[in-house]
Amino acid sequence: MAKYSSNLNLKWMPFLLLILGILIVSGCSTPTGNPDDGKRWYSMHNCFACHGPNGNDGKAPVVNNLEMSYWRFEKIIRDAGSPIMPKYPEEKISDQDVADLYAFLKAK
């Protein structure tokens, strides 16, 4: 049976940790969105009917000046778990559209 040197394994450890760190950080970054496109999406899909034209004066929760993470926002857009809030799966709204809408609401 072959014996492996622990020194050989330790030699690669910094490299493996660097790669792991890069993968973790790149997976956590918020996609870049265009607020102007997000504004169009907000109007086009009648978000203002419930959330109001400014995102803070409707029947539904306040959505302007968002403080939630992008990933939480995306989860709500995809499936809010509410019978009132429509679901927007990837077939209805692209990841870029979600990022645009998020950028618009963060900027309000």
Each model region followed by its residue ranges:
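Gly/Gly-Pro-rich "capping" loops immediately C-terminal to redox-active cysteine motifs
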Residues: 35-43, 52-87
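Sec-dependent N-terminal signal peptides
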Residues: 9-20
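The −1 position to Zn-ligating cysteines in a subset of zinc-ribbon hairpins
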Residues: 46
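N-terminal secretory signal peptides that target proteins for export/translocation
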Residues: 1-10
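C-terminal capping alpha-helices of c-type cytochrome domains
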Residues: 90-108
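Short, cysteine/histidine-rich loop/knuckle motifs that typically chelate Zn2+
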Residues: 49
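Bacterial signal peptide processing site
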Residues: 29-31
